[in-house]
């Protein structure tokens, strides 16, 4: 869908959904420019554009942690952690919009941390809401947590929503019939197909998607029973299947990750009263909670949406570990974790390439 929409003049949404109000307006011009610089090859331009989105996420994570802690080495380790997560490795390589959502959300937090003026926050939020309008809720949560002023929040939200309508109209003026208008209620009917019943397997899958599979990749499910291609999934509710950690490297990496997660939680609770960036940490938790509630019933494959919360998890951990960030032993631990992630998640990429190679 994105490959065709970004590299050809067929920009109409195949699924005719309204949740991406002016995504084409945001993505197609830079892809066209990169394609022009690459001798007219728009496909390579799209791949470079996505890779730049992934790189931007890493840079923004570094900027955020460096601004919060003043420690460049620690900031580099946390930025590398984000870049080496399964979520960012995959979506920094595929022609999809999710890596840019992560980048826009990261940018918003950087601007909040640096106490930038309202116009800058509005501009960052426009990118977020233009790609997928539901994620504007994350901007609202972050804004109100850091700037708890009702009038300011109303002014911020109203400005973004007014500009959203204008840019959506411009998007469909420049790219006719790209997708239906989001402000027409009937267009939401297309999302009914993405609603699933809440059961014990879904809750288990949700927990793993938010804290494990998005960082430490499990053994993927490859499915081709009733479709003309091989489907890569971590959760397949249609057949009640959920990916597991089967290999030794997967188990070692997941246990190491769990240990550092628990350590971060303990540090956060221990230092909660004297925490320098407490409200930003709470905002990050709030954004994760929003995604949990959203996906209780919405979404078939949670990993597909994982960039929407992986950034928040990594930034929260970066702030929680701040009290030990300058300790050499902890930096060595992070380096060891990064090494395990390179091995484990690199194996995932190799597996996907080997399975898909015969189809290319």
Provide a role label for each language-model segment.
Residues 1-13, 156-219:
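Aromatic-rich transmembrane-lumenal/periplasmic boundary elements in polytopic membrane proteins
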Residues 12-40, 44:
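Short hydrophobic/aromatic helix or loop-helix immediately within or flanking a transmembrane segment
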Residues 48-68, 263-267:
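Transmembrane-helix motifs of polytopic, lipid-linked glycan transferases
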Residues 61-84, 277, 282:
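Transmembrane-helix signature of polytopic, membrane-embedded enzymes
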Residues 93-98:
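Short acidic/glycine- and proline-prone juxtamembrane loop motifs at membrane-interface regions
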Residues 100-120, 312-316:
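Specific aromatic-rich, kink-prone transmembrane helix
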Residues 118-148, 159, 163, 336-337:
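Membrane-interface alpha helices of multi-pass inner-membrane proteins
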Residues 227-228, 232-236, 243, 250-275:
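Hydrophobic, aromatic-rich transmembrane alpha-helices
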């Amino acid at each position: 869908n994105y490959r065709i929409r970004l590299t050809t003049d067929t920009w109409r949404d195949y699924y005719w959904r309204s949740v991406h109000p002016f995504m084409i307006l945001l993505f197609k011009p830079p892809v066209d420019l990169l394609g022009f610089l690459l001798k007219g090859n728009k496909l390579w331009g799209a791949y470079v554009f996505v890779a730049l989105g992934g790189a931007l996420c890493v840079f923004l994570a570094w900027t955020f942690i460096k601004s919060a802690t003043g420690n460049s080495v620690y900031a580099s380790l946390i930025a590398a952690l984000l870049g080496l997560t399964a979520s960012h490795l995959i979506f920094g390589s595929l022609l999809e919009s999710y890596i840019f959502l992560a980048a826009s959300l990261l940018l918003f937090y950087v601007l909040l941390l640096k106490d930038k003026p309202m116009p800058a926050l509005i501009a960052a939020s426009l990118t977020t809401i233009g790609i997928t309008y539901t994620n504007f809720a994350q901007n609202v949560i972050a804004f109100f947590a850091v700037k708890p002023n009702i009038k300011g929040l109303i002014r911020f939200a109203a400005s973004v929503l007014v500009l959203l309508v204008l840019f959506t109209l411009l998007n469909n003026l420049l790219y006719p019939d790209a997708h239906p208008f989001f402000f027409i209620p009937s267009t939401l009917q297309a999302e009914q197909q993405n609603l699933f019943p809440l059961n014990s397997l879904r809750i288990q899958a949700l927990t793993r998607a938010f804290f494990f599979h998005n960082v430490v990749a499990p053994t993927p499910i490859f499915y081709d029973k009733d479709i003309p291609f091989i489907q890569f999934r971590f959760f397949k509710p249609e057949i009640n299947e959920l990916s597991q950690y089967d290999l030794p490297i997967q188990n070692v990496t997941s246990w190491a990750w769990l240990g550092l997660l628990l350590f971060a939680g303990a540090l956060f609770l221990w230092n909660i009263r004297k925490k320098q960036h407490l409200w930003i940490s709470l905002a990050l938790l709030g954004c994760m909670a929003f995604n949990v509630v959203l996906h209780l019933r919405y979404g078939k494959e949670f990993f597909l949406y994982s960039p929407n919360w992986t950034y928040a998890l990594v930034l929260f951990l970066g702030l929680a570990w701040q009290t030990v960030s300058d300790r050499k032993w902890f930096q060595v631990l992070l380096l060891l974790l990064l090494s395990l992630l390179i091995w484990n998640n690199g194996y995932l990429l190799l597996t996907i390439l080997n399975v898909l190679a015969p189809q290319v």
